[in-house]
């Protein structure tokens, strides 16, 4: 409708995150494997709050993930973020098995964060909203908060694993500087301890994809949003620095 990007009708279900996968991320996109030929469903999984949290922490979590934030989260995880990007990936030429099997997390997360920014820049708001202009501004505010969270994710990742950051320091960084609710910060601290380098992919990837898209636009000033985005997604999940070469930049 807006000539923003090519979309597909591949099946996608929103599910409650299986218990075995909980405790790291609040949501994730689980797409068919890179060599899968059957038409399987992609799952957009969302985690409920842990059963052992008290009412105060649960309320804190849902203040963080309010209705406006969920729109931004769904842009990131589903459309036109991970779900759509991985649909393009499955249709890209399988030049080598290695490229298909080993996706660049920097590109995958970078695209999803870029998708958030792109959608709010075009005034995205749910059609059912009583006041779409007000809803668009609220989602824009949440996306700016997510930009701040993305930056803090990278700082947290580095300082936890190489600078000896304590839990108190991390919680203060997230809650005071990042304006995050306690329920979000507690979960993110656990995630920082359980993973390494992944939390940095959002910031590093966003900067790489944002700059790449800007350079594609500059090289092809007559192209529509759809042409630019389809070109960026046409080679699969390649790291931004190598994608530049594939795009002739």
Residue ranges and their predicted role:
Residues 1-249:
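Long, His/Glu/Asp-enriched segments that create or flank divalent metal/ion-associated functional microenvironments
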């Amino acid at each position: 409708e807006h000539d923003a990007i090519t979309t597909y009708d591949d099946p996608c279900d929103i599910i409650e995150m299986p218990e075995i996968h909980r405790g790291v991320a609040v949501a994730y996109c689980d797409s068919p494997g890179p060599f899968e030929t059957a038409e399987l469903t992609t799952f957009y999984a969302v985690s409920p709050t842990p059963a052992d949290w008290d009412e105060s922490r649960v309320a804190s979590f849902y203040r963080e993930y309010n209705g406006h934030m969920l729109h931004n989260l769904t842009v990131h995880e589903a459309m036109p973020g991970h779900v759509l990007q991985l649909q393009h990936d499955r249709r890209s030429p399988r030049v080598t098995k290695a490229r298909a099997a080993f996706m660049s997390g920097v590109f995958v997360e970078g695209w999803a964060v870029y998708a958030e920014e792109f959608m709010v820049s075009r005034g995205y708001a749910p059609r059912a909203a009583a006041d779409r202009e007000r809803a668009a501004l609220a989602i824009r505010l949440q996306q700016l908060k997510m930009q701040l969270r993305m930056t803090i994710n990278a700082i947290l990742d580095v300082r936890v694993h190489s600078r000896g950051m304590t839990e108190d320091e991390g919680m203060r960084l997230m809650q005071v500087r990042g304006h995050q609710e306690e329920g979000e910060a507690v979960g993110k601290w656990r995630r920082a301890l359980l993973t390494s380098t992944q939390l940095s992919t959002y910031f590093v990837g966003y900067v790489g994809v944002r700059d790449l898209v800007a350079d594609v636009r500059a090289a092809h000033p007559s192209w529509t949003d759809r042409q630019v985005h389809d070109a960026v997604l046409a080679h699969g999940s390649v790291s931004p620095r190598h994608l530049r070469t594939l795009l002739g930049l």
